Regions:
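Extended hydrophobic/aromatic-rich secondary-structure runs
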Residues: 26, 99-159
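Hydrophobic core residues within well-ordered beta-strands of beta-rich domains
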Residues: 79, 93, 125-127, 146, ...
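Surface-exposed extracellular loop regions of Gram-negative outer-membrane beta-barrel proteins
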Residues: 2-14, 53-56, 130-159, 164-169
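Gram-negative/organellar outer-membrane beta-barrel architecture
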Residues: 1-123
Length: 169
C-alpha cells in the first residue's frame, strides 16, 4: 500500500503474514511490515511473532554441557514484539528508537533438575537505537541497492528484567 499515491518515487509500504512449520514439531506465525510516511521522512517498522519448537538442554556451565548424559528434551515457546520508528537524517540514512518485548516459556522438561531452580517463564523488555542505511529500490524484493542496519539493544533491570543484558546486532 502507498501512503502518498501522488509520490511515484516513494516505495510502497507493506505488511506480511508469515509462517513456518516442520515435521519435528516447530511452528511459527508472525506479522511484519514497514510503514513509510509521505516523502519517506519517517519509517515505522514492526515484527510480531510467536513460535514453538522441541529443544535440548544440558544444564548450565561447561561441565554440564560436556556431559552427554545430561541431554534432555523440553518444549520452548517464544513470542516477540519489536517496533522501531526511524527518522531520515540524510538520503537513505535513518536513525530512531526501538522497543522490544519478549516472552519465553519452557514446558515439558525431561530433567527439570538441570534447570537448577531457574524459572520456566521469563519476560524481557528492551529499549534501543537503530541505525539504518537503505538504498534498495523495492523493500521486499530489491534488485538494486544496499541494506545495512545496526541495532543497539539495552535490557536493564530497571525495566523489570530479571536477566539484564545488552546486545548489538
Amino acid at each position: 500500500y502507498r501512503t502518498d499515491r501522488n509520490d511515484s518515487l516513494l516505495p510502497p509500504s507493506n505488511v506480511s503474514l508469515y509462517g513456518d512449520v516442520s515435521t519435528v514439531g516447530f511452528y511459527l506465525l508472525g506479522v511484519r511490515g514497514n510503514h513509510l510516511f509521505p516523502k519517506d521522512k519517517y519509517r515505522l517498522n514492526y515484527n510480531l511473532y510467536f513460535y514453538s519448537f522441541p529443544s535440548l538442554y544440558w544444564g548450565r556451565g561447561y561441565d554440564n554441557g560436556a556431559n552427554s548424559d545430561n541431554e534432555s528434551d523440553y518444549k520452548r515457546f517464544q513470542a516477540q514484539v519489536k517496533v522501531d520508528f526511524m527518522f531520515r537524517l540524510a538520503k537513505n540514512f535513518y536513525i530512531g528508537p526501538m522497543a522490544i518485548f519478549d516472552y519465553i516459556d519452557g514446558r515439558d522438561f525431561d530433567k527439570p533438575e538441570l534447570w537448577e531452580g531457574m524459572a520456566a517463564r521469563t519476560t524481557n523488555t528492551s529499549l534501543g537505537l537503530s541505525l539504518l542505511y537503505d538504498s534498495r529500490d523495492f523493500l521486499t524484493n530489491a534488485f538494486h541497492g544496499y541494506y545495512l542496519r545496526i541495532d543497539l539493544r539495552f535490557s536493564p533491570a530497571f525495566l523489570g528484567n530479571k536477566y539484564a543484558f545488552s546486545s548489538t546486532e
